[in-house]
A protein has these predicted regions:
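Generic low-polarity alpha-helical segments
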Residues: 1, 62-66, 198-199
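Phosphate-binding/switch region of NTP-binding enzymes
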Residues: 91-197
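Glycine-rich P-loop/Walker A and Walker A-like loops and their local beta1-loop-alpha1 context
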Residues: 1-7
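Hydrophobic pocket-lining residues that define ligand/cofactor binding sites across diverse proteins
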Residues: 3, 58, 109
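Conserved inter-motif catalytic segment of the P-loop NTP-binding fold
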Residues: 7-100
Length: 199
């Protein structure tokens, strides 16, 4: 919402594989839905073809922000094809397809000054001291300017949940100190607490 408020002519390209963001969701944040291009996607290749086509037609002066919800939930086309063919084989093409997607989009995003926010999943490394790792392979990691891994705890009053305390773990950043932990508190009544992460 902040990007669209800052630039009157800005638009949001919203790629959706989880379908958890109906129009009412955008309206609740004060986002003008006529400035949102909502694109449902089913697989990595579909995202790649549409995103590259959109980026090819955007100029540096255009104010565009791109969101993907979620990369972690996207199958590869091969995985879908194998399912339709009733093949139960491991899909080794997904990480390769994601790496290709980010390899192709990164120059466009950088040269045209377009922010892209992508939701992804994490998994725990195997080992004595496992840590959360971003899924999807190295392409996502290397192309990113920032990678934040979010954790949360419930804020309760008795047994009633009043909101959440989020911790932003800065896994990678070109702008802030890596491995920082930034607390953000959000309550149902007041929203984001004004001084979260500052005190």
């Amino acid at each position: 919402a902040a990007y669209l408020e800052k630039y009157d002519d800005a638009i949001l390209l919203f790629y959706d594989s989880e379908f958890g963001s109906p129009q009412q969701y955008f309206k609740s944040f004060g986002i003008d839905t006529s400035r949102v291009l909502h694109s449902p996607i089913k697989n990595v290749e579909e995202l790649k073809f549409d995103l590259i086509n959109q980026l090819e037609n955007i100029e540096r002066k255009d104010k565009v922000i791109i969101m993907i919800d979620s990369i972690g939930n996207l199958a590869s086309k091969k995985e879908l094809d194998d399912t339709f063919s009733e093949k139960s084989v491991a899909d080794m093409s997904r990480a390769k397809a994601l790496k290709g997607l980010f390899r192709m989009t990164t120059p466009y995003l950088t040269m045209r000054d377009i922010p892209l926010l992508a939701v992804n999943h994490t998994y725990q490394e195997i080992g004595l001291f496992p840590k959360a790792v971003v899924s999807g392979g190295t392409g996502i990691y290397y192309s990113s300017d920032n990678i934040w891994i979010l954790g949360r705890q419930q804020e309760k009053k008795g047994t009633e949940i009043m909101g959440y305390h989020f911790i932003i773990n800065v896994e990678k950043s070109r702008f802030v100190k890596e491995k920082s932990k930034i607390p953000i508190s959000v309550t149902w009544e007041g929203g984001i607490e004004s001084y979260s992460g500052l005190l």
